[in-house]
């Protein structure tokens, strides 16, 4: 993704003799975003002077507590702290990136060249708007949220 964005920015700047400050990405697989998600994320981007504002929601499966990865013959927790947590309440809160809004600075794309740059700030969104369409089940979830919340339809 970054090489495409780098090329697009540089081509635009060359063609129009105008420098781009930031680029906003709206993933087409995230149809439940509302106008407020965009304006609030943009406000946060400006206020925090971030290189990336990315929308997130609380992670349903915390890697400090309930996710395993292969470790040789056996498995271990994906992320570990010095404590041995006995409950989910004892581990750090973790957020999952969703694709409602990504706002990158020019610096992040052209100079830092990282998907998640050092100056990343999160924009929290509710899980009910964070559904990505990757499977048929996801389409059913979206239909459920749309039927459940009629006012959502008018928030666009």
Task: Kindly label every feature range from the protein language model.
Residues 123-124, 128-156:
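Hydrophobic helical membrane-anchoring modules
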Residues 6-15:
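Short, charged beta->alpha transition segments
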Residues 1-7, 22, 31-119, 124:
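Conserved core of the sugar-phosphate nucleotidyltransferase
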Residues 15-24:
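Short acidic donor-binding loop at the edge of a beta-strand
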């Amino acid at each position: 993704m970054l090489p495409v964005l780098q090329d697009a920015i540089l081509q635009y700047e060359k063609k129009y003799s105008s420098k781009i400050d930031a680029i906003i990405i709206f993933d087409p697989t995230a149809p439940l975003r509302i106008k407020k998600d965009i304006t609030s994320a943009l406000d946060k981007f400006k206020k925090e002077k971030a290189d990336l504002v990315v929308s997130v929601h609380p992670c349903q499966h915390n890697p400090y507590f309930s996710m395993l990865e292969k470790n040789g013959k056996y498995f271990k927790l994906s992320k570990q702290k010095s404590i041995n947590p006995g409950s989910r309440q004892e581990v750090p809160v973790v957020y999952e990136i969703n694709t409602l809004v990504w706002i990158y600075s020019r610096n992040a794309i052209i100079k830092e060249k990282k998907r998640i740059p050092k100056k990343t700030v999160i924009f929290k969104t509710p899980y009910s708007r964070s559904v990505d369409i990757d499977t048929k089940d996801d389409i059913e979830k979206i239909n459920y949220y749309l039927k459940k919340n009629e006012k959502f339809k008018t928030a666009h």
